């Protein structure tokens, strides 16, 4: 099984209830597509290094998952691309222990 780290930034002007629902939805997408969620961290609101879509800050979320294939991360990326609430995301495959 491979371990992935998924980081995504939610736009800062989202309401708290909508942000909670969005985070649950996207973390749930990873779980329903066969990935095991190892940990999920909410880093809170942080300043961006540069503006993204005229936003100077955003809510950072980091999720570590373990999966046999990349189906879960592919589905996450597909839905994150079309979501207006996620302003940036990144999926990284962690190195396997040797």
Swiss-Prot record:
SUPFAM superfamilies membership: Ribosomal protein S6
Pfam families: Ribosomal_S6
One GO process term, biological-process aspect: translation
Keywords of the record: Ribonucleoprotein, Ribosomal protein, RNA-binding, rRNA-binding
Any single Gene Ontology cellular-component annotation: cytoplasm
Organism superkingdom: Bacteria
InterPro entries found in the cross-reference section: Ribosomal_bS6, Ribosomal_bS6_CS, Ribosomal_bS6_sf, Ribosomal_S6_plastid/chlpt, Transl_elong_EF1B/ribsomal_bS6
UniProt entry tagged with the keyword S-adenosyl-L-methionine: no
One MF annotation (Gene Ontology) recorded for this entry: small ribosomal subunit rRNA binding
This protein's record includes keyword Ribonucleoprotein: yes
Family that this chain belongs to: Belongs to the bacterial ribosomal protein bS6 family.
HAMAP family named in the record: Ribosomal_bS6 (MF_00360)
Protein function: Binds together with bS18 to 16S ribosomal RNA.
Protein name (database record): Small ribosomal subunit protein bS6
Natural source organism: Staphylococcus aureus (strain NCTC 8325 / PS 47)
